[in-house]
Structures are given as structure tokens and as C-alpha cells.
Regions:
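Active-site proximal helix-loop segment of RNase H-like, two-metal nucleases, encompassing DDE(D)
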Residues: 160-164
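Short acidic/His-enriched helical or mixed secondary-structure segments at domain edges of catalytic enzymes
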Residues: 155
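Active-site-proximal segment of RNA-dependent polymerases
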Residues: 1-36
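Conserved polymerase palm-domain catalytic core
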Residues: 22-111, 115-151, 159, 169-173
Length: 175
């Protein structure tokens, strides 16, 4: 399967609710963001991961990669970038997912937003994510890293996941 089951964005049949559901009613929730996500996906990563040698001859790989990249990176806003980002991130998702499963941590990635939930040391998870991203030439956006306990409002892609998945109370009151 070329796109990881841990990737929740840009996939048919996957929505915000499905993404949020696996993080429902956990003791701890950690959210991290990849800094300059699309701009951090290099021409070479697109060439190797989106257009693999066993499916495309070199000339076709080169042409397709050149069509999908701008200034040696995946451009934000291009219609092809979301699907390609999932192909490039598949090995990351599988490695991160396997690491998390061994520790009974739920993991999903929605574009550049990663969510972890369960009972664990948040620092350990953040360090591991950072190390995995570094191997790919990427880094965390530390300003968007958040740790949320059960006593606080835990949100995943705009949905509250404390006891059940629902839109936040403030939004419901506006309706």
C-alpha cells in the first residue's frame, strides 16, 4: 500500500471524524506540526518516493517530478502536492506508527499535523518525532507543539475528543 494507514488527509473515505476518533478519551494528547511541510519535501524525495524506479523509467520520473516541483521542492497550493506528500511520508508514517504501536500510543498524521494519544512521556515522543523528521531533512515547528491532559480540552483537527468526538461547545452554542 503506497499511502500509509496512519495518513488521514487527502484520502477517499477518510475525514476529520475518522482521524479524530482514534484519539478519543485518552489520558494524554500530543500535537506536533512539521515546519514548512511542503517546502521541506525535496525534488529528490518526490523523484524517489512518488515516482519509483520500478513503476517509471528514468525519463518519465524526471519529467513528472519536474512538473510536480517548483524551486526544488513540493509547492504549497498545487493540486498534486497533497497526494504526493502522502507518498513521500509513507515510510515515515510506517516507522513512526510501528514505534508508537509498541508503546500503545495512537498515532495519526493529517498533512503536517501529527497527533499522538495514550499514556506516555510526551518528551520521549517529541524527541523521537524530531529524530525521524531530521532523517528526512524536516523539522518540528516548536511553536505549534502542544501537550494536553484529560482535564483540558483535547482537540484534533478542530474536533473535541475528550469523551466523544464532537465539535467544540463554543461552536455548538453559535448554532
Amino acid at each position: 500500500r503506497p499511502v500509509s494507514s496512519y495518513a488521514a488527509a487527502y484520502r477517499k473515505g477518510q475525514g476529520l471524524r475518522e482521524h479524530a476518533e482514534c484519539h478519543r478519551d485518552h489520558k494524554l494528547l500530543v500535537k506536533v506540526d512539521i515546519h514548512d511541510f511542503f517546502g521541506s519535501i525535496s525534488w529528490m524525495q518526490v523523484y524517489q518516493k512518488a515516482f519509483p524506479w520500478y513503476l517509471f523509467p528514468p525519463s518519465v520520473r524526471n519529467l513528472l517530478t519536474n512538473l510536480c516541483c517548483f524551486r526544488e521542492a513540493l509547492p504549497q497550493g498545487a493540486p498534486t502536492s497533497p497526494a504526493i506528500s502522502n507518498l513521500v511520508m509513507a515510510s515515515f508514517d510506517e516507522s513512526m506508527g510501528a514505534w508508537c504501536e509498541k508503546r500503545q500510543i495512537a498515532y495519526t498524521r493529517y498533512c503536517d499535523d501529527m497527533t499522538f494519544s495514550g499514556e506516555f512521556d510526551p518528551g520521549m515522543v517529541i524527541r523521537k518525532v524530531s529524530a525521524f523528521l531530521e532523517q528526512m531533512g524536516m523539522s518540528l515547528n516548536r511553536k505549534k507543539t502542544g501537550v494536553y491532559t484529560r482535564g483540558s480540552r483535547q482537540e484534533v483537527t478542530g474536533l473535541t475528543v475528550n469523551e466523544r468526538v464532537q465539535v467544540p461547545a463554543a461552536y455548538r452554542k453559535k448554532l
